[in-house]
Amino acid sequence: MEIELSVIIPAYNIEPHILQRCVDSMQFISELMPYEIWIVDDGSREDYIAQWVEGLQQAHIHAIRQSNMGPGGARNTGIEHAQGRYLTFVDADDYLLYGTYYTILKHLLEKQPDILCHGSMVRYEGPAVKFMMERDICPSCCSYIIRRETLGTLRFTPHIYHEDEQFCTLLHLRRAHLLTVPENGYFYRYRPESITHNPELIHKRFLDFLTVLQNLQQTPIAPTYRPALERRLDIMAMCYLVTLMRDTNGRKQTLDSLRSLRTINLYPLPRKWHGIRYFLLRIATIHPWLVVCITPLAKQLILIHNSEDRSRSFIAHIDKWK
């Protein structure tokens, strides 16, 4: 029987009970279609995942161990081994929500799109590049179910942060039919340990973000697709500035990062209309000294906003189980 869906799970130093919850949350998929799971152990300190999978005695669950290449490299390994007609990605400490993800898979079977994006703010069905030309795309690969033929040779860049954003942008530049649905059947686990004050890691995040922007700028694409890519780059530059104000370690790092963004012509933010948030941020950050001045206030506002978002997400999740 042909495998309809391959679920790829990159795993790194994950606790067994958390991985168990992730895998258990997928059991319902068999009610709709044949599926498989590929767990890629990305060089964890303890080599237990292969033995754990063997103990499950489930023929559709597979494990691979490799040297550490980051989430992107682990997903690439999963792609190479996957046999499904469609592929999707789930992080090992997250899990699927039965009711809503069941509905998402029914959309997939009914419409048979090249790409399905769930948890979208708007409903859309049409060319993926047209969607990116008009709207903000979801930058998380875990929100997509992708036809293998559509993916083609597209892969993640290993060993970097922000690999999702590069991958999802390039995905929308493929000649593909996109379906977006409002249902969100994916539960993202809030990871307080991932918020680090390590200056070296923060510096690497900014460097990797710039690398992603440069990689996308240098992508050879048809002239008709260029406006969609440029819009996406503008939005990503806006996100870079917000991240800079949230995580920067001082005036020097702020100014150095702005200079780097200026060298690729994305600072100041290009003078275009991408909505009120983009417009206001462009005005507020048009000069480097303005960015330095507003950063302390921006840090507090972003922390408050993120805290409120986490509270709403938690309450919504509890409501689903009432």
State what each model feature region is.
Residues 66-82:
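Glycine-rich, basic loop-to-helix element that forms the pyrophosphate-binding segment
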Residues 25, 38-51, 91:
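A conserved acidic beta->alpha catalytic loop
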Residues 4-6, 25, 36, 166:
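Cell-envelope/extracellular polymer assembly enzymes that use nucleotide-activated donors
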Residues 99-129:
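Conserved donor NDP-sugar-binding/catalytic core segment of glycosyltransferases
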Residues 2, 248-322:
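Membrane-interface aromatic/basic loop that binds lipid-linked glycans or pyrophosphate carriers
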Residues 130-204:
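Conserved nucleotide-sugar donor-binding catalytic segment
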Residues 14-28:
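Short, well-formed alpha-helical segments that are part of the catalytic scaffolds
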Residues 87:
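Short aromatic/hydrophobic "clamp" motif used to bind/position activated sugar donors
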